[in-house]
């Protein structure tokens, strides 16, 4: 196929596989790739190889140093665990320690709906933050975000909302 000028002019010979197409975005420095649309029916078949259109959304701008501002995220699901593009493995329902860069990244699309965000008390300014080792996954104990001496007590609130959700 690569020697056929008609297939080259029709963008067939140089086409990516679906996997290769998404990988090309990653190699170009994009993150958070999502396949938004994939044609069920191929628009052409050549020598038993089907060609179809896919639409991919990707994001730029996650470069930078990793600083520990004592933030944590909780992956909400639906999967038992996920592995992000940087190799962070996150288990559903657990309080994960993340660097400020990852924390800010998860607060944006396409990640935001899948996480709960825990800011520290008190806030750690960027200029006071220490380097964070993103290569080792770890959980963040509530005492790290609230402080070792945190002993606040509050009045009990109604545990069910107006719609009887408990």
Which sequence ranges carry the predicted segments?
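Short, glycine-/aromatic-enriched active-site segment of Class I SAM-dependent methyltransferases
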Residues: 1-12
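Segments that shape or occlude catalytic/ligand-binding pockets
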Residues: 17
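C-terminal lobe and adjacent flexible extensions of AdoMet/dcAdoMet transferase-like proteins
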Residues: 26-166
């Amino acid at each position: 196929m690569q020697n056929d000028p008609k297939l080259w002019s029709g963008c067939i010979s140089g086409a990516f596989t679906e996997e290769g197409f998404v990988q090309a975005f990653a190699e170009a420095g994009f993150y958070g790739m999502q396949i938004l649309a994939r044609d069920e029916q191929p628009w052409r078949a050549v020598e038993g190889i089907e060609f179809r259109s896919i639409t991919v959304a990707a994001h730029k701008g996650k470069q930078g140093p990793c600083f520990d501002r004592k933030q944590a995220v909780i992956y909400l699901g639906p999967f038992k665990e996920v592995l992000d593009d940087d190799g962070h493995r996150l288990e559903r329902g657990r309080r994960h320690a993340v660097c400020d860069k990852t924390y800010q990244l998860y607060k944006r699309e396409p990640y935001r709906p899948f996480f709960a965000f825990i800011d520290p008390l008190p806030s750690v300014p960027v200029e006071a933050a220490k380097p964070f080792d993103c290569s080792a996954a770890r959980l963040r104990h509530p005492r790290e975000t609230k402080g070792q001496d945190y002993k606040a007590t509050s009045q009990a609130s109604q545990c069910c909302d107006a719609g009887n959700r408990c």
